[in-house]
């Protein structure tokens, strides 16, 4: 009887180690899928630790099969105890916060292909161009040009977040303004930022700049461009805002991706880094005709590529991606999401790139040089309010908010924290968002900003 028990025990221990080995291999495969397929290798730095961990576990459990029975027994006990402890901790946080944010909670949005809309406009003899992010410099007549605006005076096919396609007519420099705004002898206020400043995804009358105009009789120019991070925003300031020298500039910082995806990509461009020299300038405001030609030519190349894509395959892939994202959200607890985030919060020493402070300092100095004032507007992402885990556990450390605001304060910038100053008093801030802000979100923020225009704060 004792021999049978011992044999069963040994078999259980060996089977457990093999199971741990298989799980380690699955972690490696999952890491490869997320890093190399889902993110196409763009986030190696983030996932390298999971590669190392999974490879270590595979080698360790594989080697342990040759260890003594006693060692294997202790290994199984310790491993199971660790797993049970971690998942007990994880389920506590899961039950407390229910940190899932799945796309099935959103109203399903049917988006027409921007190319299809472009083709429809073409049939009506309306010149248009789908909005797309400019991520590279162009060579024109042996001169390098890096545009930071769009094509001028053209119907721009922009975005759709609430089953309503948003298009706008760009101004003489490719921004989202009525062109006549540039004819004013004096421009009082300029907005600089990404898609939130640009007005995604609402009609012209509901953007930040439009709402702010309703509250004052001042001239306001919107220089927001989707996809811009801090360095490109510095370029916009120097190339366009400096030309009009407004009294006030509202610099919009979006916590969702300004310091990660956007700034990291911008700092990889040797050309854009030339703007760290205060005197460097392309004089883009004088080159709009060239910019138009370059962007239209580049778009035609992109359009040829998209037309060669099988539409049914694209829809299938989009559906697959949506379902996969829902699956990831619904299985966060299996991947110890809360445990990993708490460890990251307490262990991670990753600092804010010092170039960010340099950019803000350069921006402030340039605005001060013509007697203007720079306002730093901190915009919170929707996830901050969807997931109470972030508020309870991370607090002001979420997205390094406190450190970012400390940098702005250290430069004596006027800081407007939309999270604390506005949304804190609102019961359900998520009601103010589609993916970007909705009409109500833009309105409540612009009402607050209008107070700074009138010097009420």
Task: Mark where each language-model region is.
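Internal/C-terminal transmembrane anchor helices
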Residues: 69-94
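Serine-dependent acyl-ester chemistry module
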Residues: 19-44, 254-405, 413, 418-426
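Alpha-helical transmembrane segments of polytopic membrane proteins
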Residues: 43-57
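Histidine-centered active-site loop/cap adjacent to the catalytic His
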Residues: 433-457
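Membrane/wall-proximal cationic-aromatic binding patches
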Residues: 98-214, 340, 421-432
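N-terminal membrane topogenic signal
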Residues: 4-20
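Alpha-helical transmembrane segments
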Residues: 27-31, 57-68
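Conserved SGNH/GDSL esterase-like catalytic core that processes O-acyl groups on lipids
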Residues: 198-279
């Amino acid at each position: 009887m004792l021999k049978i028990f011992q044999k069963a025990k040994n078999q259980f221990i060996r089977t457990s180690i093999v199971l741990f080995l298989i799980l380690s291999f699955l972690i490696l495969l999952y890491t490869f899928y997320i890093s190399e397929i889902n993110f196409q290798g763009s986030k190696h730095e983030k996932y390298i630790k999971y590669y190392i961990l999974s490879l270590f576990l595979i080698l360790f459990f594989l080697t342990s099969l040759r260890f003594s029975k006693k060692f294997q027994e202790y290994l199984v006990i310790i491993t199971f105890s660790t797993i049970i402890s971690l998942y007990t901790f994880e389920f506590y946080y899961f039950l407390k916060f229910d940190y899932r944010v799945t796309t099935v909670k959103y109203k399903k949005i049917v988006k027409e292909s921007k190319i299809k809309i472009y083709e429809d406009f073409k049939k009506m003899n309306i010149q248009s161009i789908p909005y797309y992010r400019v991520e590279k410099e162009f060579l024109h007549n042996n001169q390098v040009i890096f545009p930071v605006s769009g094509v001028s005076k053209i119907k721009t096919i922009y975005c759709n977040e609430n089953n309503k396609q948003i298009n706008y007519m760009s101004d003489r420099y490719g921004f989202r303004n009525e062109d006549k705004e540039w004819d004013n002898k004096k421009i009082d206020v300029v907005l600089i930022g990404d898609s939130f400043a640009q007005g995604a995804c609402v009609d012209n009358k509901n953007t930040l700049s439009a709402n702010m105009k309703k509250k004052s009789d001042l001239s306001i120019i919107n220089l927001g461009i989707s996809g811009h991070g801090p360095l490109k925003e510095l370029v916009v300031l120097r190339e366009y805002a400096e030309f009009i020298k407004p009294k006030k500039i509202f610099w919009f910082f979006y916590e969702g991706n300004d310091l990660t995806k956007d700034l990291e990509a911008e700092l990889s461009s040797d050309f854009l880094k030339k703007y760290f020299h205060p005197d460097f300038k392309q004089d883009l405001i004088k080159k709009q005709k060239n910019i138009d030609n370059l962007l239209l030519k580049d778009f035609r190349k992109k359009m040829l590529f998209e037309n060669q894509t099988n539409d049914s395959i694209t829809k299938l892939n989009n559906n697959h991606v949506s379902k996969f994202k829902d699956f990831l959200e619904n299985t966060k607890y299996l991947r110890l999401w809360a445990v990993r985030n708490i460890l990251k919060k307490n262990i991670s020493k990753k600092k804010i790139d010092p170039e960010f402070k340099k950019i803000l300092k350069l921006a402030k100095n340039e605005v001060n040089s013509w007697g203007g004032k720079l306002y730093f507007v901190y915009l919170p992402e929707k996830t901050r309010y969807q997931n109470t885990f972030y508020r309870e556990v991370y607090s002001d450390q979420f997205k390094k908010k406190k450190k970012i605001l400390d940098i702005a304060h250290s430069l004596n910038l006027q800081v407007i924290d939309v999270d604390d100053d506005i949304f804190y008093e609102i019961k359900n801030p998520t009601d103010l968002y589609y993916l970007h802000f909705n009409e109500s979100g833009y309105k409540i923020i612009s009402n607050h900003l209008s107070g700074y225009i009138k010097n009420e704060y």
